[in-house]
Amino acid sequence: MSLQFGPEYVRAIAPYVTGKPISEVAREFGLEAARIVKLASNENPLGMPASARVAMTAAIDGLARYPDANGFSLKAALHAKFGVPEAWITLGNGSNDILELAARALVAPGQGVIYAQHAFAVYALAAQEVGARAVEVPARDYGHDLDAMAAAITPDTRLIYVANPNNPTGTFLPADAVAAFLAKVPPTVVVVLDEAYNEFLKPEQQYDSIAWVRRYPNLLVSRTFSKAYGLAGLRVGYGIAQPQLTALLNRIRQPFNVNSLAQAAAVAALSDTEFLRRSAELNAAGYAQLTQAFARLGLEYVPSSGNFVLVRVGDDADAGARVNLALLRQGVIVRPVGNYGLPQWLRISIGLPEENAACIAALESALAQAEAAA
Protein backbone atom coordinates (compact mmCIF):
# COMPACT_ATOMS: atom_id res chain seq x y z
CA MET A 1 0.00 0.00 0.00
CA SER A 2 1.44 3.39 -0.97
CA LEU A 3 1.85 6.05 1.67
CA GLN A 4 -0.29 9.18 1.52
CA PHE A 5 1.27 12.31 2.96
CA GLY A 6 -0.47 15.49 4.04
CA PRO A 7 -4.13 16.25 4.72
CA GLU A 8 -6.77 15.17 2.23
CA TYR A 9 -7.68 18.75 1.35
CA VAL A 10 -4.12 19.38 0.14
CA ARG A 11 -4.00 16.14 -1.86
CA ALA A 12 -7.25 17.19 -3.58
CA ILE A 13 -5.78 20.43 -4.95
CA ALA A 14 -5.42 20.61 -8.73
CA PRO A 15 -2.17 22.54 -9.34
CA TYR A 16 -2.42 25.98 -10.92
CA VAL A 17 -1.69 25.84 -14.66
CA THR A 18 0.26 28.80 -16.00
CA GLY A 19 0.33 30.16 -19.52
CA LYS A 20 2.73 28.22 -21.76
CA PRO A 21 6.18 29.85 -21.97
CA ILE A 22 7.63 30.61 -25.40
CA SER A 23 10.49 28.13 -24.96
CA GLU A 24 8.07 25.26 -24.30
CA VAL A 25 5.96 26.01 -27.37
CA ALA A 26 9.10 26.29 -29.52
CA ARG A 27 10.25 22.84 -28.38
CA GLU A 28 6.84 21.20 -28.61
CA PHE A 29 5.93 22.43 -32.08
CA GLY A 30 9.38 22.84 -33.63
CA LEU A 31 9.01 26.60 -34.02
CA GLU A 32 11.53 29.42 -33.94
CA ALA A 33 11.21 31.11 -30.56
CA ALA A 34 11.74 34.60 -31.97
CA ARG A 35 8.68 34.20 -34.21
CA ILE A 36 6.31 33.07 -31.46
CA VAL A 37 3.71 35.55 -30.20
CA LYS A 38 2.76 35.17 -26.55
CA LEU A 39 -0.59 36.69 -25.59
CA ALA A 40 -1.37 34.34 -22.73
CA SER A 41 -0.35 35.88 -19.41
CA ASN A 42 -1.52 39.51 -19.47
CA GLU A 43 2.04 40.82 -19.50
CA ASN A 44 2.97 44.34 -20.59
CA PRO A 45 3.97 44.23 -24.29
CA LEU A 46 6.20 47.28 -23.77
CA GLY A 47 8.38 45.26 -21.41
CA MET A 48 9.74 46.89 -18.27
CA PRO A 49 10.24 50.64 -17.78
CA ALA A 50 13.74 51.85 -18.61
CA SER A 51 13.82 53.44 -15.16
CA ALA A 52 13.39 50.00 -13.57
CA ARG A 53 16.27 48.59 -15.60
CA VAL A 54 18.54 51.42 -14.41
CA ALA A 55 17.48 50.87 -10.79
CA MET A 56 18.16 47.13 -10.98
CA THR A 57 21.58 47.69 -12.52
CA ALA A 58 22.47 49.98 -9.64
CA ALA A 59 21.27 47.35 -7.13
CA ILE A 60 23.22 44.41 -8.57
CA ASP A 61 26.34 44.95 -6.47
CA GLY A 62 24.28 44.40 -3.32
CA LEU A 63 23.04 40.93 -4.23
CA ALA A 64 25.43 39.17 -1.85
CA ARG A 65 23.35 40.66 0.96
CA TYR A 66 19.82 39.68 1.94
CA PRO A 67 17.15 42.13 0.79
CA ASP A 68 15.55 44.59 3.18
CA ALA A 69 12.98 42.33 4.83
CA ASN A 70 10.74 45.29 5.65
CA GLY A 71 11.04 46.91 2.21
CA PHE A 72 11.65 50.38 3.64
CA SER A 73 12.21 52.19 0.33
CA LEU A 74 9.30 50.55 -1.48
CA LYS A 75 6.93 51.11 1.43
CA ALA A 76 8.06 54.75 1.57
CA ALA A 77 7.29 55.11 -2.14
CA LEU A 78 3.85 53.52 -1.68
CA HIS A 79 3.24 55.80 1.32
CA ALA A 80 4.06 58.80 -0.85
CA LYS A 81 1.70 57.62 -3.59
CA PHE A 82 -1.29 56.58 -1.47
CA GLY A 83 -0.84 58.56 1.74
CA VAL A 84 -1.14 55.54 4.01
CA PRO A 85 1.28 54.75 6.85
CA GLU A 86 3.97 52.18 6.11
CA ALA A 87 2.44 49.98 8.81
CA TRP A 88 -0.61 49.60 6.56
CA ILE A 89 1.45 48.00 3.75
CA THR A 90 2.41 44.36 3.23
CA LEU A 91 4.81 43.48 0.43
CA GLY A 92 4.33 40.24 -1.49
CA ASN A 93 6.10 38.01 -3.98
CA GLY A 94 3.54 39.15 -6.52
CA SER A 95 -0.03 39.87 -5.47
CA ASN A 96 -0.62 36.08 -5.49
CA ASP A 97 1.43 36.07 -2.31
CA ILE A 98 -0.94 38.59 -0.71
CA LEU A 99 -4.00 36.59 -1.77
CA GLU A 100 -2.61 33.40 -0.22
CA LEU A 101 -1.31 35.14 2.90
CA ALA A 102 -4.84 36.37 3.57
CA ALA A 103 -6.23 32.83 3.54
CA ARG A 104 -3.41 31.45 5.67
CA ALA A 105 -3.65 34.24 8.24
CA LEU A 106 -7.41 34.51 8.54
CA VAL A 107 -9.06 31.17 7.81
CA ALA A 108 -9.08 27.96 9.84
CA PRO A 109 -10.00 24.56 8.36
CA GLY A 110 -13.75 24.33 7.82
CA GLN A 111 -14.37 28.08 7.83
CA GLY A 112 -15.88 29.76 4.78
CA VAL A 113 -14.20 31.53 1.86
CA ILE A 114 -16.42 33.14 -0.79
CA TYR A 115 -15.47 33.97 -4.38
CA ALA A 116 -17.23 34.31 -7.71
CA GLN A 117 -17.59 31.80 -10.51
CA HIS A 118 -15.20 32.64 -13.38
CA ALA A 119 -12.91 34.54 -10.97
CA PHE A 120 -9.14 34.15 -10.59
CA ALA A 121 -8.23 30.50 -9.93
CA VAL A 122 -5.92 31.38 -7.03
CA TYR A 123 -8.92 32.24 -4.83
CA ALA A 124 -10.12 28.64 -4.88
CA LEU A 125 -6.57 27.34 -4.44
CA ALA A 126 -5.97 29.61 -1.46
CA ALA A 127 -9.16 28.33 0.14
CA GLN A 128 -8.28 24.70 -0.56
CA GLU A 129 -4.74 24.91 0.79
CA VAL A 130 -6.01 25.93 4.25
CA GLY A 131 -8.85 23.40 4.29
CA ALA A 132 -11.54 26.07 4.07
CA ARG A 133 -15.13 25.58 3.02
CA ALA A 134 -14.95 27.08 -0.47
CA VAL A 135 -18.14 28.81 -1.66
CA GLU A 136 -18.27 29.65 -5.37
CA VAL A 137 -21.12 32.05 -6.09
CA PRO A 138 -22.58 31.85 -9.62
CA ALA A 139 -21.50 34.68 -11.90
CA ARG A 140 -23.78 37.36 -13.27
CA ASP A 141 -22.97 38.43 -16.82
CA TYR A 142 -19.55 36.75 -16.49
CA GLY A 143 -18.71 38.86 -13.44
CA HIS A 144 -19.42 39.13 -9.73
CA ASP A 145 -22.95 39.00 -8.38
CA LEU A 146 -22.27 41.07 -5.27
CA ASP A 147 -25.80 40.71 -3.90
CA ALA A 148 -25.54 36.92 -4.10
CA MET A 149 -22.07 36.99 -2.57
CA ALA A 150 -23.35 39.04 0.37
CA ALA A 151 -26.26 36.62 0.75
CA ALA A 152 -23.80 33.69 0.86
CA ILE A 153 -22.16 34.97 4.06
CA THR A 154 -22.71 32.69 7.06
CA PRO A 155 -21.48 32.88 10.67
CA ASP A 156 -18.38 30.85 9.75
CA THR A 157 -17.41 32.99 6.73
CA ARG A 158 -14.01 34.59 7.22
CA LEU A 159 -12.87 35.77 3.79
CA ILE A 160 -14.33 37.07 0.52
CA TYR A 161 -12.32 37.62 -2.66
CA VAL A 162 -13.53 40.28 -5.10
CA ALA A 163 -11.58 41.09 -8.28
CA ASN A 164 -12.04 44.45 -9.98
CA PRO A 165 -11.52 44.18 -12.91
CA ASN A 166 -12.07 40.45 -12.93
CA ASN A 167 -9.66 37.98 -14.50
CA PRO A 168 -10.24 36.13 -16.87
CA THR A 169 -13.47 37.83 -17.95
CA GLY A 170 -12.47 41.51 -17.70
CA THR A 171 -15.74 42.59 -16.09
CA PHE A 172 -15.80 45.76 -13.98
CA LEU A 173 -17.74 46.65 -10.84
CA PRO A 174 -18.62 50.35 -10.52
CA ALA A 175 -17.58 52.12 -7.34
CA ASP A 176 -21.11 52.50 -5.99
CA ALA A 177 -21.72 48.75 -6.29
CA VAL A 178 -18.51 47.92 -4.41
CA ALA A 179 -19.24 50.53 -1.73
CA ALA A 180 -22.73 49.14 -1.19
CA PHE A 181 -21.32 45.62 -0.92
CA LEU A 182 -18.67 46.61 1.63
CA ALA A 183 -21.36 48.21 3.77
CA LYS A 184 -23.21 44.86 3.91
CA VAL A 185 -20.24 42.72 4.95
CA PRO A 186 -20.00 41.96 8.69
CA PRO A 187 -16.87 43.34 10.41
CA THR A 188 -15.72 39.78 11.20
CA VAL A 189 -15.40 38.96 7.49
CA VAL A 190 -12.38 40.26 5.56
CA VAL A 191 -12.84 41.37 1.96
CA VAL A 192 -9.81 41.10 -0.32
CA LEU A 193 -10.28 43.55 -3.18
CA ASP A 194 -7.94 42.30 -5.89
CA GLU A 195 -7.00 45.24 -8.11
CA ALA A 196 -4.27 43.64 -10.22
CA TYR A 197 -5.61 45.40 -13.34
CA ASN A 198 -6.55 48.71 -11.70
CA GLU A 199 -4.09 50.76 -13.75
CA PHE A 200 -5.94 49.87 -16.95
CA LEU A 201 -9.23 51.44 -15.86
CA LYS A 202 -10.55 54.30 -17.94
CA PRO A 203 -10.63 57.71 -16.19
CA GLU A 204 -14.40 57.52 -15.77
CA GLN A 205 -14.10 54.11 -14.07
CA GLN A 206 -11.43 55.03 -11.53
CA TYR A 207 -12.31 55.16 -7.84
CA ASP A 208 -10.51 55.57 -4.51
CA SER A 209 -10.31 52.15 -2.87
CA ILE A 210 -7.81 53.47 -0.31
CA ALA A 211 -10.58 55.66 1.11
CA TRP A 212 -12.52 52.45 1.72
CA VAL A 213 -9.50 50.95 3.50
CA ARG A 214 -9.51 53.93 5.88
CA ARG A 215 -13.20 53.33 6.58
CA TYR A 216 -13.27 49.52 6.83
CA PRO A 217 -10.79 47.66 9.10
CA ASN A 218 -11.86 44.42 7.36
CA LEU A 219 -10.78 45.48 3.85
CA LEU A 220 -7.50 44.44 2.20
CA VAL A 221 -6.66 45.93 -1.21
CA SER A 222 -4.09 43.98 -3.24
CA ARG A 223 -2.19 45.24 -6.27
CA THR A 224 0.73 44.11 -8.41
CA PHE A 225 3.67 45.39 -10.43
CA SER A 226 3.31 42.45 -12.86
CA LYS A 227 0.77 43.95 -15.25
CA ALA A 228 0.79 47.66 -16.12
CA TYR A 229 4.23 48.20 -14.56
CA GLY A 230 5.84 45.44 -16.66
CA LEU A 231 7.68 43.61 -13.86
CA ALA A 232 6.03 40.16 -14.01
CA GLY A 233 9.34 38.29 -13.90
CA LEU A 234 10.39 39.99 -10.67
CA ARG A 235 7.31 38.97 -8.64
CA VAL A 236 6.41 41.99 -6.55
CA GLY A 237 3.01 43.05 -5.27
CA TYR A 238 1.53 44.66 -2.19
CA GLY A 239 -1.49 44.80 0.06
CA ILE A 240 -2.92 47.83 1.84
CA ALA A 241 -5.05 47.42 4.95
CA GLN A 242 -5.36 48.78 8.45
CA PRO A 243 -2.57 47.61 10.79
CA GLN A 244 -4.61 44.92 12.57
CA LEU A 245 -4.69 43.03 9.27
CA THR A 246 -1.18 43.79 8.03
CA ALA A 247 0.28 42.68 11.36
CA LEU A 248 -1.28 39.25 10.84
CA LEU A 249 -0.04 38.97 7.26
CA ASN A 250 3.47 39.98 8.25
CA ARG A 251 3.58 37.32 10.97
CA ILE A 252 3.35 34.52 8.44
CA ARG A 253 4.97 35.88 5.28
CA GLN A 254 8.49 34.78 4.42
CA PRO A 255 10.94 37.31 5.90
CA PHE A 256 12.69 37.97 2.57
CA ASN A 257 9.78 37.43 0.20
CA VAL A 258 10.59 40.33 -2.16
CA ASN A 259 14.13 40.34 -3.54
CA SER A 260 16.44 43.34 -3.79
CA LEU A 261 16.15 43.79 -7.56
CA ALA A 262 12.36 43.63 -7.38
CA GLN A 263 12.23 46.27 -4.65
CA ALA A 264 14.55 48.61 -6.55
CA ALA A 265 12.68 48.18 -9.82
CA ALA A 266 9.28 48.67 -8.19
CA VAL A 267 10.35 51.94 -6.55
CA ALA A 268 11.48 53.26 -9.94
CA ALA A 269 8.43 51.98 -11.82
CA LEU A 270 5.99 53.45 -9.32
CA SER A 271 7.02 56.99 -10.21
CA ASP A 272 7.29 56.39 -13.96
CA THR A 273 3.97 57.98 -14.90
CA GLU A 274 4.99 58.34 -18.55
CA PHE A 275 5.47 54.57 -18.87
CA LEU A 276 2.03 53.98 -17.33
CA ARG A 277 0.48 56.49 -19.72
CA ARG A 278 2.07 54.76 -22.73
CA SER A 279 0.94 51.36 -21.43
CA ALA A 280 -2.66 52.49 -21.03
CA GLU A 281 -2.65 54.15 -24.46
CA LEU A 282 -1.25 51.04 -26.15
CA ASN A 283 -3.78 48.89 -24.31
CA ALA A 284 -6.73 50.98 -25.47
CA ALA A 285 -5.56 50.85 -29.08
CA GLY A 286 -4.94 47.10 -28.89
CA TYR A 287 -8.36 46.50 -27.35
CA ALA A 288 -9.98 48.30 -30.28
CA GLN A 289 -7.85 46.34 -32.76
CA LEU A 290 -8.83 42.97 -31.28
CA THR A 291 -12.51 43.65 -30.65
CA GLN A 292 -13.05 45.11 -34.12
CA ALA A 293 -11.57 41.92 -35.56
CA PHE A 294 -13.79 39.77 -33.33
CA ALA A 295 -16.85 41.69 -34.52
CA ARG A 296 -15.78 41.23 -38.15
CA LEU A 297 -15.37 37.48 -37.54
CA GLY A 298 -18.76 37.28 -35.83
CA LEU A 299 -17.26 36.26 -32.48
CA GLU A 300 -18.86 37.07 -29.16
CA TYR A 301 -16.58 38.70 -26.59
CA VAL A 302 -16.94 40.08 -23.08
CA PRO A 303 -16.24 43.83 -22.83
CA SER A 304 -13.04 44.10 -20.81
CA SER A 305 -11.55 46.65 -18.42
CA GLY A 306 -8.23 44.80 -18.24
CA ASN A 307 -5.37 44.19 -20.68
CA PHE A 308 -7.02 41.11 -22.20
CA VAL A 309 -10.25 40.05 -23.89
CA LEU A 310 -12.33 36.91 -23.39
CA VAL A 311 -13.65 35.69 -26.75
CA ARG A 312 -15.95 32.80 -27.65
CA VAL A 313 -14.50 30.66 -30.44
CA GLY A 314 -17.19 27.99 -30.82
CA ASP A 315 -20.23 26.34 -29.34
CA ASP A 316 -19.13 22.83 -28.42
CA ALA A 317 -17.26 21.92 -25.25
CA ASP A 318 -14.01 21.30 -27.14
CA ALA A 319 -13.99 24.59 -29.05
CA GLY A 320 -11.54 26.45 -26.84
CA ALA A 321 -9.05 23.59 -26.65
CA ARG A 322 -9.30 22.89 -30.39
CA VAL A 323 -8.77 26.49 -31.49
CA ASN A 324 -6.03 26.94 -28.90
CA LEU A 325 -4.12 23.98 -30.37
CA ALA A 326 -4.50 25.39 -33.88
CA LEU A 327 -3.11 28.72 -32.66
CA LEU A 328 -0.16 27.04 -30.95
CA ARG A 329 0.75 25.27 -34.18
CA GLN A 330 0.91 28.71 -35.81
CA GLY A 331 3.11 30.08 -33.03
CA VAL A 332 0.48 32.08 -31.14
CA ILE A 333 0.05 31.46 -27.42
CA VAL A 334 -3.24 32.48 -25.79
CA ARG A 335 -5.00 31.20 -22.69
CA PRO A 336 -7.66 28.47 -22.78
CA VAL A 337 -10.07 28.91 -19.88
CA GLY A 338 -11.84 25.58 -19.64
CA ASN A 339 -10.63 25.33 -16.05
CA TYR A 340 -12.71 28.44 -15.32
CA GLY A 341 -15.86 26.75 -16.60
CA LEU A 342 -15.53 28.50 -19.98
CA PRO A 343 -14.50 25.73 -22.42
CA GLN A 344 -15.81 27.55 -25.51
CA TRP A 345 -13.73 30.65 -24.80
CA LEU A 346 -10.14 31.89 -25.01
CA ARG A 347 -8.54 34.75 -23.11
CA ILE A 348 -6.29 36.83 -25.36
CA SER A 349 -3.87 39.33 -23.86
CA ILE A 350 -3.49 42.66 -25.63
CA GLY A 351 -0.09 42.95 -27.28
CA LEU A 352 1.80 45.20 -29.66
CA PRO A 353 -0.09 46.06 -32.88
CA GLU A 354 1.90 43.52 -34.89
CA GLU A 355 1.35 40.83 -32.25
CA ASN A 356 -2.39 41.48 -32.24
CA ALA A 357 -2.41 41.31 -36.05
CA ALA A 358 -0.57 37.98 -36.01
CA CYS A 359 -3.06 36.62 -33.48
CA ILE A 360 -6.04 37.79 -35.53
CA ALA A 361 -4.66 36.18 -38.70
CA ALA A 362 -3.93 32.92 -36.88
CA LEU A 363 -7.37 32.94 -35.27
CA GLU A 364 -9.07 33.50 -38.62
CA SER A 365 -7.11 30.57 -40.07
CA ALA A 366 -7.94 28.34 -37.10
CA LEU A 367 -11.65 29.13 -37.35
CA ALA A 368 -11.62 28.44 -41.10
CA GLN A 369 -9.96 25.07 -40.47
CA ALA A 370 -12.58 24.22 -37.86
CA GLU A 371 -15.41 25.16 -40.21
CA ALA A 372 -13.93 23.09 -43.04
CA ALA A 373 -13.60 20.08 -40.76
CA ALA A 374 -17.18 20.35 -39.49
Curated annotation (Swiss-Prot):
Catalysis performed (reactions) = L-histidinol phosphate + 2-oxoglutarate = 3-(imidazol-4-yl)-2-oxopropyl phosphate + L-glutamate
Spell out the PROSITE patterns in the cross-references.
Answer: AA_TRANSFER_CLASS_2
The GO terms this record gives for MF are: histidinol-phosphate transaminase activity; pyridoxal phosphate binding
Q: What Enzyme Commission number does this protein have? A: 2.6.1.9
Q: Name one Pfam family in it.
A: Aminotran_1_2
Q: Which UniProt keywords apply?
A: Amino-acid biosynthesis, Aminotransferase, Histidine biosynthesis, Pyridoxal phosphate, Transferase
N6-(pyridoxal phosphate)lysine sites (modified residues) = K227
GO terms in the biological process aspect are:
L-histidine biosynthetic process
Name the needed cofactors: pyridoxal 5'-phosphate
Q: What Gene3D superfamilies does the annotation carry?
A: Aspartate Aminotransferase, domain 1, Type I PLP-dependent aspartate aminotransferase-like (Major domain)
Highest taxon above the source species: Bacteria
Homology family: Belongs to the class-II pyridoxal-phosphate-dependent aminotransferase family. Histidinol-phosphate aminotransferase subfamily.
Q: Which HAMAP family match?
A: HisC_aminotrans_2
Q: What is this protein called?
A: Histidinol-phosphate aminotransferase 2
Annotated source species: Ralstonia nicotianae (strain ATCC BAA-1114 / GMI1000) (Ralstonia solanacearum)
